[in-house]
Amino acid sequence: MAPPAARARYIANKADNQILSKKPPKRPGLNGNNKTKEATPAGKKKDKDAKKRNQPTSGGQEKGLPNPIMPSVQTAFKTFVSARLCSAIWAYIADCDETFNYWEPLHYIINGHGLQTWEYSPQFGLRSYTYLLLQGVPGYFYQKLFNPSPILIFYMVRCMLGFGCAVMERYMYKSICQEFGIHIGRLWLIFQLFSVGMFVSSTALLPSSFSMYFGCAALAAWWQQNYCFAIFLTAISALLGWPFAALIGIPLVLEMLLRQRDWKTFVQWTLISGATVAIPMIAIDTSYFGKLTFAPLNIVWYNVFTSHGPNIFGTEPLSYYIINGFLNFNIIWLLALQLPIMLVIDYLIVPAKSKSTLNFPHYISLAPLYLWLLVFFAQPHKEERFLFPIYPLISLCGAITVDVYQRIFFRMKSVVFKIKAGVHYLDHSMFIAILVMVTSTLLGLSRVFALYRNYHAPMDLMLELNQFKATPQYDPDVIYNVCIGKDWHRYPGSFFFPAKNFRLRFLKSEFRGMLPAYYDEGQNATKVVQPYFNDLNQENEHMYFDYDRCDFLVDFDEGKYTALEPNYSKRSKDWSVMKSLPFLIPEKSHKVLRAFYVPFLTDNHIQYGDFNLLKRKTKRNGR
């Protein structure tokens, strides 16, 4: 429970965060009911407020001004579910790590075959099967009960992930409205709904997305001073999801130990939470790997304490995250980065009453975002998914920055034009919030449309392969080899194959790194140590397949060819084109217009190649 002084400041702040007319209307509570009493600013008596509400004023509600838009928690939840289901259906798989490290092992758990990466080899044990079972168990029963097409299992899992994300966002929305005010909560809601980053990450089968769900839910619990629940959610995020997500919980730990001095609760719930999550996790992973395995410890050891670590997979400059942040959050990203400076300016020129929050000052409650950026910006190896856990915080900090700009604008205007006391800052500055919301929404929709248009071809192309199952040529007793060369990283996964008798095969290309291989047949396949796996990203000839044994071939024709990467579609004696879809050629396209779709302009400044699905003409083995 917040102290009386903080509670009084919060009540004043909540009143500040309404779009006040001269005659404020009764409004529903956060849960959509009308039982919540109107907030009374600190230092004001109810009878005086009632008299003011009964006095007619020019421009008030009696002239037909609309009620303020304050979505209830249930309304917000419905919009979140709608947005995340759209992501489940239309988002493409942006990261090959998601395909090979998660969708493929999940396919193995559900259907008994799939590709294995070196991270799942028992001698390394960097990935946890426990995390996969959260999706694998529902998918397994769905498959056994209804025997659906594999692609339906894929989209069922995605819808589950999207719904889980929406539940987190609902909880966080309520907490933000309580801690930071309804105006900021409303801005955050809009930014989340139209964020490209959330569109991509919310339904991604990645531990970093899982950590986003539970890490941000932990922050929401913390802002409500539900410390025990916050610790438990942080443990789930870090142990069952991504261990580096524990970084989000550091400000929570410091606040408990240094400000609250509640060592007993912290130690007690850390032990309870750790044991509750870690013990079953170790038991499950040990049974899969055939040896004692604690995957979170292994991945931390590999990334931090080995001599090579993740840098062998590529390094990027600091600008990578700056550009990536703008692509995923556009102007909201820029606003979030400048929040610390804007809070200082706000502190210097805006009266203190306008800066209140319920429980924590901004430098504590928002510290997880900037701590995360400080740590991950400094790492040479950068991936888009590394920022997933803080995506909702980017929207929140962007919303707070907009609110600060509104306060500063009103303060400056009130000094210059001598605005009378009692006028609310939102009456004169709401155009700033509307301008930011409209701009960010248009940029977000433009980016989402560009992503779907430019990069969705591999998923659509694999769906075409499902049509082959309905032809007389299909034989359920034959293994069909679907080959892929240089475009292996664009493969969306075995769930897109029409049946269990299709296999992905790799053709040798200019790529010289480690590729996955199929799990062995049999019940103990996850326990087998394969000699061809290594943790140095070195290629192994075992992964390559004989070109002459391919039944289908997936290839992107971008106009560049080598001896190992020929134009397969031109080999008309061997192949016929089943389907060809446009796929962006980045090097031949305008940088801005390929990133954001602009009607009447984009088509004239970008270039597509043909993403082809080829079927072998000549029969083999009598087929």
UniProtKB/Swiss-Prot annotation:
GO terms for cellular component: endomembrane system; endoplasmic reticulum membrane. It is found in: Endoplasmic reticulum membrane. It catalyses: an alpha-D-Man-(1->2)-alpha-D-Man-(1->2)-alpha-D-Man-(1->3)-[alpha-D-Man-(1->3)-alpha-D-Man-(1->6)]-beta-D-Man-(1->4)-beta-D-GlcNAc-(1->4)-alpha-D-GlcNAc-diphospho-di-trans,poly-cis-dolichol + a di-trans,poly-cis-dolichyl beta-D-mannosyl phosphate = an alpha-D-Man-(1->2)-alpha-D-Man-(1->2)-alpha-D-Man-(1->3)-[alpha-D-Man-(1->2)-alpha-D-Man-(1->3)-alpha-D-Man-(1->6)]-beta-D-Man-(1->4)-beta-D-GlcNAc-(1->4)-alpha-D-GlcNAc-diphospho-di-trans,poly-cis-dolichol + a di-trans,poly-cis-dolichyl phosphate + H(+); an alpha-D-Man-(1->2)-alpha-D-Man-(1->2)-alpha-D-Man-(1->3)-[alpha-D-Man-(1->2)-alpha-D-Man-(1->3)-[alpha-D-Man-(1->6)]-alpha-D-Man-(1->6)]-beta-D-Man-(1->4)-beta-D-GlcNAc-(1->4)-alpha-D-GlcNAc-diphospho-di-trans,poly-cis-dolichol + a di-trans,poly-cis-dolichyl beta-D-mannosyl phosphate = an alpha-D-Man-(1->2)-alpha-D-Man-(1->2)-alpha-D-Man-(1->3)-[alpha-D-Man-(1->2)-alpha-D-Man-(1->3)-[alpha-D-Man-(1->2)-alpha-D-Man-(1->6)]-alpha-D-Man-(1->6)]-beta-D-Man-(1->4)-beta-D-GlcNAc-(1->4)-alpha-D-GlcNAc-diphospho-di-trans,poly-cis-dolichol + a di-trans,poly-cis-dolichyl phosphate + H(+). The chain crosses the membrane at residues 152-172, 193-223, 229-254, 266-284, 326-348, 360-378, 390-410, 431-452. One of its GO terms (biological process) is protein N-linked glycosylation. It is a multi-pass membrane protein. Probable alpha-1,2-mannosyltransferase involved in the N-glycosylation pathway. Probably involved in glycosylation of the TNF receptor grnd, regulating its ligand affinity. Required for normal epithelial growth and architecture. Suppressor of JNK-dependent intestinal stem cell proliferation. Keywords: Endoplasmic reticulum, Glycosyltransferase, Membrane, Transferase, Transmembrane, Transmembrane helix. Induction: Down-regulated by bacterial infection in the gut. It holds the Pfam family Glyco_transf_22. Belongs to the glycosyltransferase 22 family. It comes from the Eukaryota. It comes from Drosophila melanogaster. Disruption phenotype: Imaginal disc cell proliferation is slowed resulting in smaller imaginal discs with aberrant architecture compared to wild type larvae of the same age. RNAi-mediated knockdown in gut progenitor cells results in increased intestinal stem cell mitotic proliferation. This is Alpha-1,2-mannosyltransferase Alg9. Its EC number is 2.4.1.259, 2.4.1.261. Pathway: Protein modification; protein glycosylation. GO terms for molecular function: alpha-1,2-mannosyltransferase activity; dol-P-Man:Man(6)GlcNAc(2)-PP-Dol alpha-1,2-mannosyltransferase activity; dol-P-Man:Man(8)GlcNAc(2)-PP-Dol alpha-1,2-mannosyltransferase activity.
